[in-house]
A protein has these predicted regions:
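Glycine-rich, flexible loop motifs
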Residues: 1-33, 53-61, 66-149, 165-264
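Short glycine-rich or small-residue beta-strand-to-loop segments that form or flank ligand, phosphate
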Residues: 34, 153-157
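Short acidic, Gly/Ser-rich segments with clustered Asp/Glu that frequently serve as metal-coordination loops
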Residues: 41-42, 69, 159-164
Length: 264
C-alpha cells in the first residue's frame, strides 16, 4: 500500500499480522492509513490504527471504550504533602468505584441515553447510569501531576464504561449481519410492517415477520466478522450513538472530578 505510514520503530508480530489482515481486504485497499506510535495488538483488530475509510466505518476499529480520554483539572499551587496525598487516596478509594463496580445510587441523570438508536438493545440501563462517576479498570487512572511552574493538576483517565462496549458490540454485530445480506431482510421487514399497518392487519404482523425471517438465506461475508463495516443509514446511526457515548464518557470524568473535589 502506497498511502501507508507507520509512526513506530518496533511493532509486535501479532499487531503486524492484524495490520496486514486489514490492509489485505479489497474494501480498504485505497484508504489513507496511519499507524500510531502506541500500536499494539487488540481484540480482533490492531490498536493505533487510523484511516480514512470514506463512507465506511468499522465499530470494532473505533473500539469498545468509546470516548475514552483524559480530564485535566487545575488545582493551582495547592500543597500536596504525605497527609494530603493519603487523604486523596482515601477519598478516591471510598467515593470513586473502580473495576466493574458502580455507585449504589445514580449521581446524575443522563437523559441522552434514551436518544440512542440502539437504546432498546442495551442491558441494565439503570446500572449504566450508576456507572457515571466511576473509574473502571485496565489502564484507567487518577493522579495529581505537577507542572514546571509548580501548578498542580488532577488528571482523570477513563471512558464510557460498559455503555461504550455495549454500543460497539451491537453495531459490530449489526455490520456482520448486514454483510450477511440482512440489509435486504430489514428493508423488506420495514415495508411489511408499513403495508400491514396501512391495510389494518396489525395482528398479522408478527407471524408475517416470522415467515419472512424463516425464508431468509444468509450469505458468507468476504470480510472477517471483526472487520465488517457499516454504510449508509446504519453508519449514520452508529455515529449518532457514538457521539452520545462520547458525551457520557466526558460526564463520567467530570463527575469523578466533582466527587473528589467535594470530599477534599
Amino acid at each position: 500500500m502506497s498511502n501507508l505510514k507507520v509512526y513506530a520503530k518496533t511493532i509486535e508480530d501479532e499487531a503486524l499480522e492484524q495490520i496486514n489482515t486489514l490492509l489485505s481486504q479489497d474494501a480498504f485497499k485505497d484508504c489513507k492509513v496511519r499507524i500510531m506510535p502506541d500500536v499494539h495488538a487488540g481484540k480482533g483488530c490492531v490498536i493505533g490504527f487510523t484511516a480514512d475509510l470514506g463512507n465506511k466505518v468499522i465499530p470494532n476499529i473505533v473500539g469498545v471504550d468509546i470516548g475514552c480520554g483524559m480530564l485535566c483539572v487545575s488545582l493551582g499551587h495547592r500543597d500536596f504533602n504525605a497527609v494530603t496525598l493519603n487523604t486523596l487516596d482515601r477519598v478516591i478509594r471510598t467515593y470513586v468505584p473502580s473495576g466493574k463496580n458502580v455507585h449504589d445510587g445514580r449521581q446524575m441523570r443522563f437523559e441522552e441515553l434514551k436518544e440512542l438508536y440502539c437504546y432498546r438493545e442495551l442491558k441494565d440501563t439503570k446500572r449504566l447510569e450508576r456507572s457515571i462517576g466511576t473509574l473502571g479498570g485496565g489502564n484507567h487512572f487518577i493522579e495529581v501531576d505537577v507542572a514546571e511552574d509548580g501548578y498542580k493538576y488532577l488528571i482523570i483517565h477513563t471512558g464510557s464504561r460498559n455503555l461504550g462496549k455495549q454500543v460497539a458490540d451491537y453495531y459490530q454485530n449489526l455490520a456482520y449481519e448486514l454483510m450477511c445480506g440482512k440489509d435486504d431482510l430489514y428493508d423488506r421487514q420495514e415495508k411489511l410492517i408499513a403495508d400491514y399497518k396501512a391495510a389494518g392487519r396489525k395482528s398479522e404482523i408478527e407471524s408475517a415477520i416470522k415467515e419472512l425471517r424463516r425464508n431468509f438465506r444468509a450469505v458468507t461475508p468476504k470480510l472477517p466478522k471483526d472487520l465488517c463495516y457499516l454504510e449508509g443509514k446504519y453508519r449514520e446511526q452508529y455515529l449518532h450513538d457514538m457521539r452520545i457515548c462520547q458525551e457520557f464518557a466526558y460526564m463520567n470524568r467530570v463527575m469523578i472530578a466533582q466527587i473528589i473535589c467535594n470530599h477534599m
